UniProtKB/Swiss-Prot annotation:
Outcome when changing Q7H: In strain: CEN.PK 113-7D
Known outcome of mutating V49L: In strain: CEN.PK 113-7D
Origin: domain of life: Eukaryota
Effect of mutating V40A: In strain: CEN.PK 113-7D
Annotated source species: Saccharomyces cerevisiae (strain ATCC 204508 / S288c) (Baker's yeast)
Protein name: Putative uncharacterized protein YIL058W
Length: 94
């Protein structure tokens, strides 16, 4: 899992170890870019987040969760939105 040490990110992410549940509100697929927008319950509060997913042999898992109010979108040094590219079927584990 990533802990916020991603090139181009300047704001803190929700530690994945603190996420205890999520509800999928919106799913957007742009080519191989998979973006899920939902509401996550985490230790210490409840907030809207943007989920970024990545693929593994077991399926797709959350790679990043971002506070939109703090970081509306994550961009790399080339100005591209940071999203994971997936080729497998996307599923959300509750």
């Amino acid at each position: 899992m990533m802990d916020g040490h991603v090139q181009g990110l300047r704001k803190p992410l929700i530690p994945m170890s603190h996420v205890v549940g999520c509800n999928l509100l919106l799913y957007i697929r742009l080519g191989c870019r998979e973006i899920y927008v939902g509401c996550v319950h985490y230790q210490g509060g409840f907030t809207n987040v943007i989920f970024y997913f990545k693929c593994s042999n077991e399926g797709c898992i959350i790679s990043l969760a971002v506070f939109p109010a703090i970081l509306p979108a994550a961009y790399n040094s080339h100005g591209e939105r940071i999203v994971a590219c997936c080729g497998c079927n996307m599923t959300v584990a509750y």
